[in-house]
Swiss-Prot record:
UniProt domain ACB: residue ranges: 3-88
Family, per entry: Belongs to the ACBP family.
Protein's GO biological process: fatty acid metabolic process
Name assigned to this protein: Acyl-CoA-binding domain-containing protein 1
Binding site for an acyl-CoA: K15, Y30, G31, L32, Y33, K34, K56, Y75
Gene Ontology CC entries for this record: cytosol
GO molecular function: fatty-acyl-CoA binding
Organism: Oryza sativa subsp. japonica
InterPro entries in alphabetical order: Acyl-CoA-binding_prot_CS, Acyl-CoA-binding_protein, Acyl-CoA-binding_sf, FERM/acyl-CoA-bd_prot_sf
Induction (free text): Induced by cold stress. Down-regulated by wounding and infection with the rice blast fungus Magnaporthe oryzae.
Keywords: Cytoplasm, Lipid-binding
Location within or outside the cell: Cytoplasm, Cytosol
UniProt xrefs under Pfam families: ACBP
Keyword NADP: no
Length: 91
């Protein structure tokens, strides 16, 4: 399987992560996903009253400059790590 297919597979697996997944980890995944699918941030930073959107924008901005392939690879690695942690916590 190619990187794109693996990425799509792990994007689906990410949806099965437990509710207990930290917001920090969710934001990391969000930023990597956006970088992999869109590229560098292409919108203005949301205002101070839009805290959730601002946090998501900041997570995306944090990975600015990564190639789409690098972002896909990092995303896959992070999802694998979180799935392993969830499995270990469940046993």
């Amino acid at each position: 399987m190619g990187l794109q297919e693996d990425f799509e597979q792990y994007a689906e697996k990410a949806k099965t992560l437990p509710e207990s997944t930290s917001n920090e980890n969710k934001l990391i995944l969000y930023g990597l996903y956006k970088q992999a699918t869109v590229g560098d941030v292409n919108t203005a930073r949301p205002g101070i009253f839009a805290q959730r959107d601002r946090a998501k924008w900041d997570a995306w901005k944090a990975v600015e400059g990564k190639s789409k392939e690098e972002a896909m690879s990092d995303y896959i690695t992070k999802v694998k790590q979180l799935l392993e942690e969830a499995a270990a916590a469940a046993s």
